[in-house]
Amino acid sequence: MTKKLFMFEKPLGMRDTLPFLYEIKKRVRQAMIREIETWGYELIETPTLEYYETVGTVSAIDDHQLFKLLDQQGHTLVLRPDMTAPIARLAASRLYKEGNPLRLAYNANVFRAQQREGGRPAEFEQIGVECIGDGTVAADAEVISVMIAALRQAGLQHFTVTIGHIGYVNALFLEIVGNEERASVLRRFLYEKNYVGYREHVKSLPLSSIDQKRLLQLLHLHGNDMTMEEAKELVHSEEGKRAVDDLCELSNALQLYGVDDVVKIDMTLVSHMSYYTGILFEVYAEHVGFPIGNGGRYDELLEKFSRKAPATGFGIRVDRLIEALGESEEEAAIECIVFSQERFAEAIELARTKRREGKRVVLQHISGIRDIDAYSKRYKPITYLLGSTEKE
């Protein structure tokens, strides 16, 4: 009984991909990868399974979201929860030589366990890049520009890249509230975009009115109305001021790339990915309630694999990108040749000719079809080679 109950069910958060959606994903994937490769990024693959003690613990994904299993030797493995940590492992162990930046790209599925069915997938496809070994703001600008170019090649026209600096937020919070525990509470409000809760929490803190005002002023440092001078005046530490300088330099570089029209600065931007150390960014598109992609600088991650190197990168959620594109569920154009036994050779030759022309062609024996009317609705056009005459 239990076996029959789950016969057509899938594990929580898992999805099937039907032909029409697969075709859309393939087109989007190919367009993005072609663009990424023109920037000199090289595609790599990493294993679906990684050791929990290395990649699993280094990943910024919460432990309860990891799919865990044991191998034959009793080692705990995880299905990769993101691609940044596996690529950091690979770069640190096999590829990176100090002073020689790496430009790597990937197209892979990642896995994150869901506690309940809420419409969020437990497996999804990501396309992204990692620039490893280059600590300059120019590298951040390049990564963001690659992402924008790839999204445009995929067909996305209306989107916004929101850019911030986690170093700025951390510097401001630590100099006012004094310790990481209190700062993490404030960051959580910002990550959840719970600005009402943030304001109420700030007002409840035992701080001077001046410091409370500084924390509240942070919420106004975004969009076209803010200036970098305002951001710099709000923070006192050198680390915070350097973060503002980084963003100024980044803005100038993005203007040179000609992509500043889709970029906006938001000094409140934080991420749930704990390994980010500097500039970070998210991509938002119309009609999609979540970021379709994100990225940033993670200069301390490779150090966890015993190889110190700066790095920056991005990842795009293909499922959310397709939602943003609003692609119609049109099936790909596939022709069909329906033939009878006496015209089998003729049908094979015709199909071969059409395929040489780049067309997609199904070859179907008439005896294998039960309902010709229903079958014919799947293909266009259909060529019939039956008996001694040909109908179209």
Swiss-Prot record:
**GO biological process, alphabetically ordered:** histidyl-tRNA aminoacylation; L-histidine biosynthetic process
Q: One Pfam family of this protein, by short name?
A: HisZ-like
Q: Name one GO molecular function term.
A: catalytic activity, acting on a protein
Pathway per its UniProt entry is:
Amino-acid biosynthesis; L-histidine biosynthesis; L-histidine from 5-phospho-alpha-D-ribose 1-diphosphate: step 1/9
Origin: domain of life: Bacteria
Listed A to Z, the keywords are: Amino-acid biosynthesis, Cytoplasm, Histidine biosynthesis
Keyword Amino-acid biosynthesis present in the record's keywords: the answer is: yes
Listed HAMAP family: HisZ
Protein's job: Required for the first step of histidine biosynthesis. May allow the feedback regulation of ATP phosphoribosyltransferase activity by histidine.
Descriptive protein name: ATP phosphoribosyltransferase regulatory subunit
UniProt source species? Geobacillus sp. (strain WCH70)
* UniProt gene name: hisZ
